[in-house]
């Protein structure tokens, strides 16, 4: 009888996990390359991954989320907004906090090729007079804020504030595989003081635990998932190791060291890192990354990527991140990205001066290897090897 009760409780707990399936698609970079536009794009758009974090010029009405920095993203999920629901493909981004999608008020070419929200077709939409501006590349996405019901993984998140874009300059966004972005970081970095989607879910009692978790599949187009309100142990092996946040805003933690063959190659004496599902690569200080690129034999090609010989993967050593005393090795098969164009490094350089020293971004290259729990209740991140 006790076993039946226990099984029932387990089934109940499992049922309270709300899962969003993520689909792996061609990245914006791949689409531009296939359409013969990548080289021209790279000549006119400066890739600056650092500009996403700790913006110095952002105001309460401006969010600094450069869309050009999402050009290598491959994982996307579906949400709906309004009554009846209107569907959108979004990036679930733990490196930002706002939700925004294109609207019918946007006549830019980029918007015309994507799903656009029509407030007039939603009986639950509530307008505001607030504007929002999200900077990227050589222009910015401008729009207005409104409230409506957002459905995510079967959760009806009512009275959710979100951005409706009115202008998206930059023809390259015409080819982007996503409509908008759903931010999952803390409210403190949200533009316009907008309540993030997950906070609104928790405040309304729509999830059973104040956490969400992410599994990114390495190979398949399907299989990746974001889970709201719970943890599914079938996605990882061993036990979760918990890492306290060093700062609450981004999902920021302390890294003890980064080594190769037992020798330090970066992060001497420790460094800070943001765990970010909205960054595809693994980013760090320019000088440190240049050292790593040299050690793995990477050199820049005409597509702006650091090319690596595919045949070298089997001979390259692990790069080990030690976090809270636990080692997290990345094999070459993880940090060397393979595509139809060839092989390239999964590392990219960026310099973000912070009061706590050098900053790294643990993007999808890292998260594909380690199931990640984002625990808001205890302000910590849980990591375990993927199953």
UniProtKB/Swiss-Prot annotation:
The keyword Secreted applies. The modification Phosphoserine is found at residue 129. It catalyses: Preferential cleavage: hydrophobic, preferably aromatic, residues in P1 and P1' positions. Cleaves 1-Phe-|-Val-2, 4-Gln-|-His-5, 13-Glu-|-Ala-14, 14-Ala-|-Leu-15, 15-Leu-|-Tyr-16, 16-Tyr-|-Leu-17, 23-Gly-|-Phe-24, 24-Phe-|-Phe-25 and 25-Phe-|-Tyr-26 bonds in the B chain of insulin. It comes from the Eukaryota. Disulfide bonds join 106-111, 267-271, 310-343. It is found in: Secreted. The keyword Phosphoprotein applies. The active site is at 93, 276. Keywords: Aspartyl protease, Digestion, Disulfide bond, Hydrolase, Phosphoprotein, Protease, Secreted, Signal, Zymogen. One of its GO terms (biological process) is digestion. GO terms for cellular component: extracellular region. Residues 1-15 form the signal peptide. CDD domains: pepsin_A. SUPFAM superfamilies: Acid proteases. InterPro entries: Aspartic_peptidase_A1, Aspartic_peptidase_AS, Aspartic_peptidase_N, Pepsin_A, PEPTIDASE_A1, Peptidase_aspartic_dom_sf. Pfam families: A1_Propeptide (PF07966), Asp (PF00026). Residues 75-384 form the Peptidase A1 domain. One of its GO terms (molecular function) is aspartic-type endopeptidase activity. Its EC number is 3.4.23.1. It is an enzyme of class 3 (hydrolase). Residues 16-61 form a propeptide. Shows particularly broad specificity; although bonds involving phenylalanine and leucine are preferred, many others are also cleaved to some extent. Belongs to the peptidase A1 family. This is Pepsin A. It comes from Sorex unguiculatus.
